[in-house]
């Protein structure tokens, strides 16, 4: 079994153990490895435009807001935008700040026919540290 297969199997087992309805749950490091090893895999960043502009972007990511900024309203066109930009047959990974919005996006994608939908745990900024701040522990930025 190669590194890609091992990584996906681990993510799939993690999803089964957590009773998640999508294909798998990846750590940020695992997601990076998948992007390098899986031709055609896509990363969908579901943070807001403000987060992309002020916190940082992931190169080559598909950017679709889950919650619209300003106003923090749900993006009623999320699924239509996803279908326009990402083939339901490819492996797709969802990323947000902490892993919560991306979990919701992966749920919706899986329910809508994306059989290879994965959530990226910890998100872009990682978990909160002892002082309640992000960007110090884990996350995509530190993978």
For each predicted feature, which ranges?
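Structural scaffold elements adjacent to functional motifs in cytosolic proteins
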Residues: 43-45
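Short, surface-exposed ligand- or partner-binding patches at beta-edge/loop junctions that are enriched
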Residues: 94-95
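Rhodanese-like catalytic fold shared by cysteine-dependent sulfurtransferases
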Residues: 1-40, 49-91, 102-143
């Amino acid at each position: 079994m190669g590194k890609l297969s091992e990584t996906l199997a681990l993510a799939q087992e993690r999803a089964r153990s957590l009773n998640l309805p999508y294909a798998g749950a990846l750590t940020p490091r695992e997601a990076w490895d998948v992007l390098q090893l899986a031709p055609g895999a896509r990363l969908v960043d579901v943070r807001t435009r403000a987060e992309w502009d002020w916190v940082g972007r992931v190169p080559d990511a598909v950017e679709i807001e889950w919650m619209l900024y300003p106003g923090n309203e749900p993006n009623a066109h999320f699924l239509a935008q996803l279908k326009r930009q990402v083939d339901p047959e490819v492996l797709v990974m969802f990323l947000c700040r902490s892993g919560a919005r991306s979990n919701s996006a992966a749920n919706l994608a899986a329910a809508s026919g994306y059989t290879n939908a994965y959530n990226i745990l910890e998100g872009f900024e990682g978990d909160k540290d002892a002082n309640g701040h992000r960007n110090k522990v884990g996350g995509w930025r530190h993978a």
